[in-house]
């Protein structure tokens, strides 16, 4: 007989079997569905990455995603994976940044923070920090630091600045376009543009410098050993102050420079390591400041024959510690407007300096002018010192054995002669024309001087207060101080210490007693007497 329905026992058995089947099968079914979704998601991600790569990426020869192009906006990549090792940053003329990041060959887009309209963008993976700002329409400010890496600047007139950075752990470049033409005009201010730059190469071949007026400090402390500036248009430049200060360029050919509008060349080659400087085309007719221009420069010779110095007022430290053993063109210098020559040849390596045409009638300071100079002789016969007030250390350590023209010096306005001939190698000093009536300090004036003969017959020391160490270790055998009035002197300590003098004359017995009073600082063989 046909059975029409399941018994209760049979139903329970069926339900039990189905329950067992569900318990066993459902997880597998769920996993299968999940795997399908993940597979679909992976496919979507792969397609998205491929699309992104096609729009933004550039693969290298090995197929590795190497570089990015067509950057997207900061906000478009925000809140996505922040792991990255490459980035491209662009700035528009308002200072807004657009960024694309790529991480570890995984085609990921990272995130980056954009701060305001003057965007500061930092790419930091422990190796580099990049910060760049474009501010006012005519001024370029920067702060670019790259730790233990290398970067190279290039310029394109249509796209602007480009900087290629190479991390110390990688050879892959990171291309970052910085500020280019601002308001669609060529930059007029290149002041300090490559200051402290660690770029080993600076390509300026496409520079448009036709509107530039300021190149002050442009390559200051730049480590680039070679600079090709032949394409520079400097026709509108007015200041080159410190332009190559501390530059590591080994040679500088500036023969194409138009310097006709330049007024400031102070510190231009300060601490420059360039051993060769081609300045043959320099027009310096408008230059007013040449202070420290070649200080510590490593140029072995200087040809300044083309220099027109008729408007220069400041030559302070111009050749201070210059390595040039020869300086051509000094005899052509027009120095009629120069007011300060302090330290001008201080520690200069030039063994011969022709100052025959120097007009020093406007000079007020000759402080340390020949301090440590390597010139073996000095002819100052043309010097007009009538307005000089400071001759402190003027010949300190000078190796010149002869100094011509001292007998013509007009020192009527000089107030400071301290250390004037300290350690000077001059064997004889004719100071018979010296008017020292306004001098207040003569401390160390002849300390360690090698002059065996010193004519002090015209010295008026009535206003001098300091004679400390004045003749210490002086080689002069006779000290005729019979013109000296020491009534206002407050310090005579060590005045004759280790002096080689054996004969001394004083104006009055009171002066003689003062000179003889110190037995500790006066040689035992030197006794001062009143000159009859």
Predicted stretch roles:
Residues 2-29:
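N-terminal single-pass transmembrane signal-anchor helix
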Residues 34-62:
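Membrane-proximal N-terminal amphipathic helix
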Residues 54-132:
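Periplasmic/extracellular, small/polar-rich flexible segments of pilin-like filament-forming proteins
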Residues 124-532:
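Negatively charged
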């Amino acid at each position: 007989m046909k059975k029409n329905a399941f018994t209760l026992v049979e139903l329970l058995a069926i339900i039990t079997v189905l329950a067992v089947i569900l318990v066993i099968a459902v997880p597998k079914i769920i996993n299968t569905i999940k795997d399908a979704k993940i597979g679909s998601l992976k496919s979507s991600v792969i397609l998205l990455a491929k699309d992104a790569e096609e729009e933004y990426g550039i693969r290298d020869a090995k197929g590795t995603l190497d570089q990015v192009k067509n950057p997207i906006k900061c906000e478009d990549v925000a809140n996505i994976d922040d792991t990255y090792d490459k980035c491209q940053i662009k700035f528009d003329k308002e200072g807004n940044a657009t960024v694309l990041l790529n991480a570890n060959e995984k085609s990921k887009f990272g995130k980056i923070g954009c701060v305001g309209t003057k965007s500061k963008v930092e790419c930091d993976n422990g190796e580099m920090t990049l910060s760049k700002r474009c501010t006012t329409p005519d001024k370029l400010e920067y702060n670019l630091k790259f730790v233990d890496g290398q970067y190279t600047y290039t310029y394109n007139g249509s796209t602007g600045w480009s900087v290629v950075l190479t991390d110390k752990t990688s050879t892959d470049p990171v291309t970052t376009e910085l500020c280019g033409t601002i308001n669609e005009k060529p930059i007029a201010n290149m002041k300090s543009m490559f200051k402290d730059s660690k770029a080993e190469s600076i390509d300026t071949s496409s520079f448009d410098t036709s509107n530039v007026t300021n190149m002050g400090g442009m390559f200051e402390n730049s480590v680039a050993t070679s600079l090709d500036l032949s394409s520079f248009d400097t026709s509108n430049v007015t200041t080159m102050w410190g332009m190559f200060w501390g530059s590591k360029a080994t040679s500088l050919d500036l023969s194409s420079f138009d310097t006709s509008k330049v007024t400031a060349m102070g510190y231009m080659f300060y601490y420059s390591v360039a051993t060769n400087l081609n300045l043959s085309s320099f027009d310096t007719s408008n230059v007013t400041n040449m202070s420290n221009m070649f200080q510590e420069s490593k140029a072995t010779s200087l040809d300044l024959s083309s220099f027109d110095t008729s408007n220069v007022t400041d030559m302070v430290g111009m050749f201070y510690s210059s390595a040039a053993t020869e300086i051509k063109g000094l005899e052509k210098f027009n120095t009629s407007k120069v007011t300060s020559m302090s330290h001008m040849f201080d520690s200069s390596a030039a063994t011969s300096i022709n100052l025959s045409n120097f007009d020093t009638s406007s000079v007020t300071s000759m402080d340390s002018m020949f301090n440590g100079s390597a010139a073996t002789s000095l002819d100052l016969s043309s010097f007009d010192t009538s307005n000089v007030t400071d001759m402190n250390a003027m010949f300190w350590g000078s190796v010149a054995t002869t100094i011509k023209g001292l007998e013509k010096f007009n020192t009527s306005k000089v107030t400071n002669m301290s250390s004037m001939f300290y350690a000077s190698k001059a064997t004889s000093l004719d100071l018979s024309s010296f008017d020292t009536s306004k001098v207040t300090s003569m401390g160390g004036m002849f300390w360690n001087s090698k002059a065996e003969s010193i004519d002090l017959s015209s010295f008026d020391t009535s206003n001098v207060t300091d004679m400390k160490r004045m003749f210490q270790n002086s080689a002069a055998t006779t000290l005729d101080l019979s013109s000296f009035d020491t009534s206002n002197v407050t310090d005579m300590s060590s005045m004759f210490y280790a002096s080689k003098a054996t004969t001394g004359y004083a104006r009055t017995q009171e002066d003689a007693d003062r000179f003889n009073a110190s037995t500790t600082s006066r040689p035992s063989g030197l006794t001062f007497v009143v000159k009859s």
